[in-house]
């Protein structure tokens, strides 16, 4: 079984883990209703994608 020969220091461990943190998502705005949404997705409030009506949304 493989065993490390020497102990890794805390600094070396933390430098390796520096890229593991969660990144903030970049919200886009719908071109039709200006609703905040994730990029490359259909707008859940109006049903538009890329300036075109893709699906119909029933109003509550």
From Swiss-Prot:
Compositionally skewed regions (Basic residues) per UniProt: 1-16
Signal peptide: none
GO molecular function, one term: structural constituent of ribosome
Annotated stretches, region: Disordered: 1-20
Phosphoprotein as UniProt keyword: no
BP GO annotations: translation
Keyword annotations from UniProtKB, A to Z: Ribonucleoprotein, Ribosomal protein
InterPro entries reported in the protein's UniProt record: Ribosomal_bL32, Ribosomal_bL32_bact, Ribosomal_zn-bd
Alphabetical list of Pfam families matching this protein: Ribosomal_L32p
One GO CC term, this protein: large ribosomal subunit
Family membership: Belongs to the bacterial ribosomal protein bL32 family.
Listed name of the protein: Large ribosomal subunit protein bL32
Species of origin: Chlamydia pneumoniae (Chlamydophila pneumoniae)
Lineage of the organism: Bacteria, Pseudomonadati, Chlamydiota, Chlamydiia, Chlamydiales
């Amino acid at each position: 079984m493989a065993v490390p020969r020497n102990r890794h220091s805390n600094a070396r461990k933390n430098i390796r883990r520096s890229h593991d943190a969660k990144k903030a998502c970049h919200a886009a705005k719908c071109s039709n209703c200006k609703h905040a949404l994730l990029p490359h997705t259909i707008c859940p409030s109006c049903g538009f994608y890329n300036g075109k009506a893709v699906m119909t949304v029933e109003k509550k």
